[in-house]
Structure formats: C-alpha cells, structure tokens
C-alpha cells in the first residue's frame, strides 16, 4: 500500500511539471540587473538595443518568439538559456 501511494505521489509531481521556469534579465540599464520569471509559454530571452538621441537604449525581457527584424540600426538578440540576455 505504501508503495502504491509513493508511486502516485511521484507520478503526480512528474505530471504537474513543478520544476523549470525560465528567467531572463528585464528592464533596461539597471545596475544591478534585475530578472523576471517568464510565463510557461515564453521560450526566449531577448535584448533590443538601439541609439536614440546619441544615447544607447536597451530593452530586455521574455518573449514567445524570437524577433529577427533589424531596422533603423536596431539590434535584436535572442537566446534560450537562463539570464542569457545580459
């Protein structure tokens, strides 16, 4: 009976997927950098950087897809590891 109960507990934990949530750096030029927990469907961390008024602007966060559009000098970087968008 204990074996059956233990098996059910292990199966429940495995089915709930209690483990992994991706973390990405967020916001812009904060020091120290802050992170956010991404929602379950967010697979990518991104970093957008561009020059506006002679000042570099940076935006970071979680994303469902990896945008690959580069326009007007804007650089977009995507990655899939935790905190890889430094």
Swiss-Prot record:
Keyword Zinc: no
GO molecular function: toxin activity
Intrachain disulfide bonds: 24-45, 38-62, 66-78, 79-84
GO cellular component: extracellular region
Species assigned in the record: Bungarus multicinctus
Keyword Cytoplasm attached: no
CDD domains, sorted: TFP_snake_toxin
Primary site of residence: secreted
Protein's name according to its UniProt entry: Short neurotoxin homolog NTL1
Signal peptide as annotated in the record: 1-21
Cellular location(s): Secreted
PROSITE patterns on file: SNAKE_TOXIN
Tissue: Expressed by the venom gland.
Keywords, in A-Z order: Disulfide bond, Secreted, Signal, Toxin
Entry similarity comment: Belongs to the three-finger toxin family. Short-chain subfamily. Orphan group IX sub-subfamily.
């Amino acid at each position: 009976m204990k074996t059956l109960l233990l098996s059910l507990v292990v199966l429940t934990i495995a089915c709930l997927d209690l483990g992994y949530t991706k973390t990405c750096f967020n916001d812009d030029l904060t020091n120290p950098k802050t992170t956010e927990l991404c929602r379950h469907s967010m697979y990518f961390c991104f970093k957008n950087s561009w020059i506006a008024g002679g000042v570099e602007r940076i935006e970071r966060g979680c994303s469902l897809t990896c945008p690959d559009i580069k326009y007007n000098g804007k650089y977009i970087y995507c990655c899939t590891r935790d905190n890889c968008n430094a």
